[in-house]
Amino acid sequence: MTTKLTVVVAAVGLVLAVVPVRAHHAFAAEFDQAKPIKVQGSVTRWELTNPHSWIYIDVKDADKTVTWMIEGASPNNLYRLGLTKESLPIGSVITVEGYQAKDGSTRAVGRDIVFANGKKFFLGLMEAEGAPKQ
């Protein structure tokens, strides 16, 4: 009886531990497929941190400059896709396509970045649960 109870408690604990992890990786939890974005701006910061990288770009609007925070895949995934720390020097002008945060802020998940020379890179997060299919 004690062994069965231990197994049941352990199984329930594992199931409960998986739920927050799935929510963390669910595209639909934070981003809106109905809000595609395409912004062009200058890189002001690039954080290659786990579990996700962040690219900050200043986008000039009609009368002001707005900073967009673009979420990308982990540094390891980006390296495998061909992006390194040297790929995005501060001041680089890039175009980002992706999906805006549900809260309407200037935060988005990036799908692709395009450099001034036309070279395009996938940012690696579109396999997340609930993400739009390319």
PLM segments and residue spans:
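Bacterial N-terminal signal peptides that target proteins for export
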Residues: 1-9
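Conserved hydrophobic positions within beta-strands
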Residues: 39-43
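Short aromatic-glycine-enriched beta-strand elements
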Residues: 49-59
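Short, structured beta-strand/loop micro-motifs enriched in basic residues and often containing a Trp
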Residues: 71-80
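Short nucleic-acid-contacting surface segments enriched for D/E, G, S/T with interspersed K/R
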Residues: 80-96
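OB-fold/S1-family single-stranded nucleic acid-binding modules
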Residues: 101-125
